[in-house]
Amino acid sequence: MLTLDTLNVMLAVSEEGLIEEMIIALLASPQLAVFFEKFPRLKAAITDDVPRWREALRSRLTDARVPPELTEEVMCYQQSQLLSTPQFIVQLPQILDLLHRLNSPWAEQARQLVDANSSITSALHTLFLQRWRLSLIVQATTLNQQLLEEEREQLLSEVQERMTLSGQLEPILADNNTGAGRLWDMSAGQLKRGDYQLIVKYGEFLNEQPELKRLAEQLGRSREAKSIPRNDAQMETFRTMVREPATVPEQVDGLQQSDDILRLLPPELATLGITELEYEFYRRLVEKQLLTYRLHGESLREKVIERPVVHKDYDEQPRGPFIVCVDTSGSMGGFNEQCAKAFCLALMRIALAENRRCYIMLFSTEIVRYELSGPQGIEQAIRFLNQQFRGGTDLASCFRAIMERLQSREWFDADAVVISDFIAQRLPDDVTSKVKELQRVHQHRFHAVAMSAHGKPGIMRIFDHIWRFDTGMRSRLLRRWRR
């Protein structure tokens, strides 16, 4: 069967002009005009998608089949072009019958032209073929326009769905034109409104926690530059962390009286459920007279010293991908879970804006992986946000998975980020030594995002940077009060 592309070539119909007209009409539609005004960053991303639209439309016209009736009429026209005038006169009755049988738009006009002339001359033969060709061109153009109109409606529907999705997620995930472009590319998947609303929900939560958002931005910029020393140095304040014995959850050392709700003895907690003893419980809480476990271990304390300023200039450093390990143990549930997921969303925003990769691994009793910056990034982000934090803590497996990933060539300059409360068993010696080797030999950097003030120093000392975001009730109230 004849293809539409072949028919266009035979009749010299310009399909490129029809495609350009359709694309211009699509870009000038009121829906896109309003969207471009509201989201100017996405305008460039959609405009960059125009070549793909053009190629898809061209492919559609190339593969389209011409109706059998029109195919038969075109074949008859081609055969008629090869006839001499005497041969054409002989074949004319059959040609007219064929046109009538095919319900050709040219059939009635052809019969009128023949009836209006008593004899068929060479000039009339040429005129007949010219007008017949014009009729075929009109039919081919109409067929092209019908197919393009169908494609336009389908394309407009697809663009509107992607605009709705991108418009909802642009304030959350697009920090610049690069991020907007990658967001538009990822919006091509089949997503329903209820799916991506989960990202909107965590985006709103992140906006309510500006300190958490700022922490993610600082981590993203932490590889921004390196310093170059100079001779004339001034003094500056320098803060460092020192270890000292303190009350941290490493070892139970006895009982004490305090107001530490997390370490409360069960009998004390039972009095809270007795109406007659409730006020007595609150009194002892205020006076720090509740019986709690006394814990013994090491803690980190901030020490402030003065030292010379040695920074003179900054040299831009390459920023690699993120490998983020998220603790999904039961202790990370609730508010910790919300913060961990929102923090990953903030890292995804940074990765899209800076054209970096963002790879998420959830560690508990098994490792679950998500690529948030790939073509299916939005679907992967939704699956990640739907995960529940109810497992145990296997920090060693997390580090082994990170180290295995870092050995791959495409991740040689990656930064590893571990999000946890770090209330877990000590790391095996082989894991610790391997991490130190990666830090020393390959300059890999390990970041800890600590969601608790009670993380074990023995675990956290292997990290290059510790970003603290205490999710305890006291810290949450203080942050709210400061805002």
Curated annotation (Swiss-Prot):
Cross-referenced PANTHER family: PROTEIN VIAA
Protein name, UniProt field: Regulatory protein ViaA
Pfam families: VWA_CoxE (PF05762)
Keyword vocabulary terms for this entry: Chaperone, Cytoplasm
Gene3D superfamilies reported for this sequence: von Willebrand factor, type A domain
Superkingdom per UniProt: Bacteria
Listed InterPro entries: Uncharacterised_CoxE, Uncharacterised_ViaA, VWF_A, vWFA_dom_sf
Function of the molecule: Component of the RavA-ViaA chaperone complex, which may act on the membrane to optimize the function of some of the respiratory chains. ViaA stimulates the ATPase activity of RavA.
Keyword Cytoplasm among record annotations: yes
Quaternary assembly: Homodimer. Interacts with RavA.
HAMAP family linked to this entry: ViaA
Cellular localisation: Cytoplasm
Organism: Shigella dysenteriae serotype 1 (strain Sd197)
GO cellular component terms attached to this protein's record: cytosol
Similarity comment: Belongs to the ViaA family.
